[in-house]
């Protein structure tokens, strides 16, 4: 369903936005994992 864009018509801005969204998503994942880890350690110290 249009998941793979035709390489003949690729808008550089779209590519940049895609990379940006990927990077943001990756950072959010990492942050939430760090948060989970921190919560775990806090629970263990109590």
UniProtKB/Swiss-Prot annotation:
GO terms for cellular component: extracellular region. One of its GO terms (molecular function) is hormone activity. Keywords: Amidation, Hormone, Secreted. It is found in: Secreted. The modification Isoleucine amide is found at residue 46. Pfam families: CRF. Its main location: secreted. Regulation of fluid secretion. Stimulates primary urine secretion by Malpighian tubules and causes a dose-dependent stimulation of cAMP levels in the tubules. Belongs to the sauvagine/corticotropin-releasing factor/urotensin I family. This is Diuretic hormone.
């Amino acid at each position: 369903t249009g998941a793979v864009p035709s390489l003949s018509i690729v808008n550089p801005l779209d590519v940049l936005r895609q990379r940006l969204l990927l990077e943001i998503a990756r950072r959010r994942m990492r942050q939430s994992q760090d948060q989970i880890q921190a919560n775990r350690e806090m629970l263990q110290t109590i």
